[in-house]
Structures are given as C-alpha cells and as structure tokens.
C-alpha cells in the first residue's frame, strides 16, 4: 500500500507553511515570519465513491486513511483494503488531496448501507451523520491481554514528560494535536500530529495497522481532551488505555466503561485522574 502522488507534488508537505506576520509586543509592532499548520480538505474515496471530506494536515495521509477506515468500522482489518492511492493537488487554487481506497466488496456494501456522508470540520468525528440512531454507542469489549497489569506505575508520567519532544510541528506552529503510541514503561514508540485530534489518532491507528503492530499491547497518549469519538476509535481496535492531557467528556467516560477501556485524563508528570474501566 504505497501512496502514489500527482505530478503536481513529488514530496508530501511537511505540515506547516511560513507566512509573513505583524507581531505586537509591548506596544511595538514588528514584521516577521511565522509558521502555521497546514489544513487541507482531504477526500476519502472508497471504491470510486466519495465518502468523507475531512479537514486535516496533509502528511501521513496513507496512515490517516487506513486508520479512518478501521476506526470508523468501514473495514474490519487492514487486509480488507486491497489498494490505496494518495493524490495531492498542492498547486490548485485550494490545495487539497484525495485518498482512494479499494476495499473488499463486503465492506463496500456495508458502507453504502450506512448512508453516511461526512463533511468534516477539522476532524470532527460525527459531522454529517443523518440521525442520532446512527451513533455507534455500543463498543465491543476490549480484550484483556494483561497489558494493564504490566503497566509501570510511572508510565503515564513518563509519557507526559516525553510527548513534547515528539511534537515537532506543534513546537513550530503552536497549534497541532498529537497522538502517541506508548509501551508498558511509558516510552513513546510512535507519534503523529494533525490540526484535528481525531485525525492524529487515525494516523496513529493506521500506522499501527500498516506495521501489523499489536494494538492491545500499548496505550495511546493524546495531547487533547478525551471526546466520545476518540475513545470509540481506540476501543474499536482494542487499545486498552487512553490517556489525555485535558478533560474527558461524560460520554467518553461512559463509552470507556462499556468497552472495559481504562480512561485517564489531566495527565501530568506529577499525577493524573483515573476514570476507571468498569
């Protein structure tokens, strides 16, 4: 599943662009240059049919598309995706991208039955859903592989300390979210950034799927709050623990409990708040 690109751009954007700005400090105005995170419309096309247009940072798009397909339940496993093509239109009046996925017929038929057309605002996970009845609020139970029993007491503190070093785009722009994959000691093994927190998680999940990693043998550390969609995505792929820097929502806590997933928020080097698993 190697992405192919249009003739317009041979290398993916790095996720930030430099722009001239006027900076006011202490009453003095100065001209300077600053970096801002890129935000592009990215169309996700399944078997030739456009299913979603998400607003995201145009890098790691293959991983993003695979993660979206898995975490939204469009496909059950990575092998259900037969081919994938990333097309970048960097020189268009509105820079945008398309990701074409060829999925097995069973998955495509189920997708058409869902009649779901998303028009995402910066990675919004339920934009465009046609009715409340279509909300997926009954997660599968996360398998108990013994990972939580192996989790080091200082794993969350260690991950909180290490995350900034994996946020190159955030350091450059000050405005992106990060999703990191951590082992039982809290060491960060992979991290992805995006203007949308859901997109960052999808990129991480897609990367894990593409590398055939065991998604039950680690935890996710997020730079954002814990919303229902993020917890639901993690539960779908069997991730046993979601840790976030900011607050959880009430529905995120309910979904975590229903899935048997441990949800921990307000994570700092000095402590955290555990919302339980049952």
Swiss-Prot record:
Keyword set, alphabetical order: Cytoplasm, Molybdenum cofactor biosynthesis
Molecular function terms from GO: sulfur carrier activity; sulfurtransferase activity
GO cellular component: cytoplasm
Record: active site: 124 (cysteine persulfide intermediate)
Gene3D superfamilies named among the record's database cross-references: 3.10.20.10, Cytidine Deaminase, domain 2
Gene Ontology biological process terms in this record: Mo-molybdopterin cofactor biosynthetic process
Range of residues in the leader sequence: none
Keyword tRNA-binding carried by entry: no
Keyword Hydrolase: no
Subcellular localization(s) per the UniProt record: Cytoplasm
Function: Required for formate dehydrogenase (FDH) activity. Acts as a sulfur carrier protein that transfers sulfur from IscS to the molybdenum cofactor prior to its insertion into FDH.
HAMAP family for this protein: FdhD (MF_00187)
Protein family: Belongs to the FdhD family.
Identification of the protein by name: Sulfur carrier protein FdhD
Source organism of this protein record: Burkholderia cenocepacia (strain ATCC BAA-245 / DSM 16553 / LMG 16656 / NCTC 13227 / J2315 / CF5610) (Burkholderia cepacia (strain J2315))
Gene: fdhD
